[in-house]
Amino acid sequence: MLTLDTLNVMLAVSEEGLIEEMIIALLASPQLAVFFEKFPRLKAAITDDVPRWREALRSRLKDARVPPELTEEVMCYQQSQLLSTPQFIVQLPQILDLLHRLNSPWAEQARQLVDANSTITSALHTLFLQRWRLSLIVQATTLNQQLLEEEREQLLSEVQERMTLSGQLEPILADNNTAAGRLWDMSAGQLKRGDYQLIVKYGEFLNEQPELKRLAEQLGRSREAKSIPRNDAQMEAFRTMVCEPATVPEQVDGLQQSDDILRLLPPELATLGITELEYEFYRRLVEKQLLTYRLHGESWREKVIERPVVHKDYDEQPRGPFIVCVDTSGSMGGFNEQCAKAFCLALMRIALAENRRCYIMLFSTEIVRYELSGPQGIEQAIRFLSQQFRGGTDLASCFRAIMERLQSREWFDADAVVISDFIAQRLPDDVTSKVKELQRVHQHRFHAVAMSAHGKPGIMRIFDHIWRFDTGMRSRLLRRWRR
């Protein structure tokens, strides 16, 4: 069956103009205008999505199938172009019957044109084909517009859902334009209002605890190890095979519009033999709009480039990713649980604003992992906030999981953060020695966020920094009184 993309090429219908008109109309819609005014940071993020919309619309038009009736009419039109005037006169009754059977918009006008002339001349033959072509162009344009209108409604519905989600979470998670852009990318998932209200709830709780929020910001500004390129690295030759277009064509690859006379399609060449269409042929030749075969060839060659033998040194630089371990034991329930979750939400906000990664691990009797800065970050955050803290405490497993993560290249410069009340058994000697080795050799930094004033000093001595946030009743009352 004929595709809409092929039909557009055959009739020289430009779908690009239709796509641009639809996108401009979408961006100018009242819903987006009000949203842009209310959330200016998200305007750039939505605008950056326009190329993706454009590509999706092109793909939709390219893959769309032309209705069988229109396909049959187009085939009949192409065959009629090849007929001489005497042959056309013989075939005309069958052509009119076919147009009537297909309910073509051109059927009634075609019959009126024939009935109004007693004899069929070559000029009438040319006029018939020209008007028929115009009718087909109108039908193709209408089909393009119908498909684009369907896509516009679907796209507008998707954008409105994402705007609702992003608008709710922007005050909580978007601290700058970078965070707003990443938040918009995350909003592409299938989420309902009740899902993300959990993030809103903990965002409001974080605003009620400014000391906790300030603690997260201080931790976010700390320094950690980061890889940097070496200046004195030796170079080595690296060989790879690259594919390049060949100068000699090898096979037919498709159709294209050009002025290549040697590769013309037969229907195009036939119009040159019709006197009335000769000027039309030359016009399309000058404008490079003639349908021709597209030929293609490939050749492979070896390419040699030089690259450094040793790529990286390591030095202290700010702003690496976060690896956060959260204690989910029973002693961390209640207010401690709220503070731990809100603190992770604050780290997620910092990670989005500074284009960092934020990886959460919950430890009790088993390890559960969430990445809050990935494409599914909002869904992962909702799952994390839905967890309840009712397990035991296995701090050793937590450290082993952190050290395993730090071995990978993408997390080599990460900050490790452990959130706990640190009421637990002492760490095994092998874990302690491995942590000290990472601190000494690779300059990794381990941070403790202590939720209790009764944490064991023997455990906490292993950390580079200890950030204290006492959740006892006395400390909570003092903080409230100071505010």
From Swiss-Prot:
GO cellular component, one term: cytosol
Xref: InterPro entries: Uncharacterised_CoxE (IPR008912), Uncharacterised_ViaA (IPR023481), VWF_A (IPR002035), vWFA_dom_sf (IPR036465)
Gene3D superfamilies: von Willebrand factor, type A domain
Keywords: Chaperone, Cytoplasm
Keyword NAD on entry: no
Predominant place of localization: cytoplasm
Keyword match Transferase: no
Compartments reported by the entry: Cytoplasm
Function of the protein: Component of the RavA-ViaA chaperone complex, which may act on the membrane to optimize the function of some of the respiratory chains. ViaA stimulates the ATPase activity of RavA.
The protein's assembly and partners: Homodimer. Interacts with RavA.
Family of the protein in this entry: Belongs to the ViaA family.
Protein name per its UniProtKB record: Regulatory protein ViaA
Organism, scientific name: Escherichia coli (strain 55989 / EAEC)
